Amino acid sequence: MSQRSAAVFRETKETSIRLDLVVDGQGLVNVHTGFGMADHVITLAAFWAGFDLTLSCTGDLEIDAHHTVEDVGLCLGQALAEALGERSGIARVGFARVPMDEALADVCIDISGRPWLEWRGDDLLPPVIAGQERDLWREFLKAFASAARMNLHVSFLYGRNGHHLLESAAKGLGLALRQAVRRDRETLLSTKGSLD
């Protein structure tokens, strides 16, 4: 069975990103973006997915974290899409509901070739988390879902602490990814015979 992995390098005037992803890993994760909360969220998602991930990013954090986080999302999605190839034989769908103290989030995905982010309940998030606007996390997942060509639904059900809500969603994303990328059968899981 071939190893599902990918390496991505992206260099722009705003960011420089290098990452290596192994889908069938052991949860060995090393992330350095220069923005601690992004490192934490990405580490949680990759660990709970069982991925091995090495990621380094240098970005224009003197402006804010937007370019860094969005570009990292794009690169992560690109790496996942490349590692999965034609997506033949994967379970394709995954979902998880994860608590973190008082917070609860639902995450559902379909690695269908149809990019979409549905982002609900973000009014529960405080306007600023770790010094950045809450919209940053929607942009991160929008970039990830688009580049990975997946349908991604994140719903914050309840909670008061922004960190806890994001952690709940990050773990949920990881668990949903673990289910969706699982090798399930030899054929493409689609009645139409295509995932685009």
Swiss-Prot record:
Its main location: cytoplasm. PROSITE patterns: IGP_DEHYDRATASE_1. It comes from the Bacteria. Its EC number is 4.2.1.19. It catalyses: D-erythro-1-(imidazol-4-yl)glycerol 3-phosphate = 3-(imidazol-4-yl)-2-oxopropyl phosphate + H2O. It is found in: Cytoplasm. GO terms for molecular function: imidazoleglycerol-phosphate dehydratase activity. GO terms for biological process: L-histidine biosynthetic process. Keywords: Amino-acid biosynthesis, Cytoplasm, Histidine biosynthesis, Lyase. GO terms for cellular component: cytoplasm. Pathway: Amino-acid biosynthesis; L-histidine biosynthesis; L-histidine from 5-phospho-alpha-D-ribose 1-diphosphate: step 6/9. It is an enzyme of class 4 (lyase). It holds the Pfam family IGPD. InterPro entries: IGPD_sf (IPR038494), ImidazoleglycerolP_deHydtase (IPR000807), ImidazoleglycerP_deHydtase_CS (IPR020565), Ribosomal_Su5_D2-typ_SF (IPR020568). Belongs to the imidazoleglycerol-phosphate dehydratase family. This is Imidazoleglycerol-phosphate dehydratase.
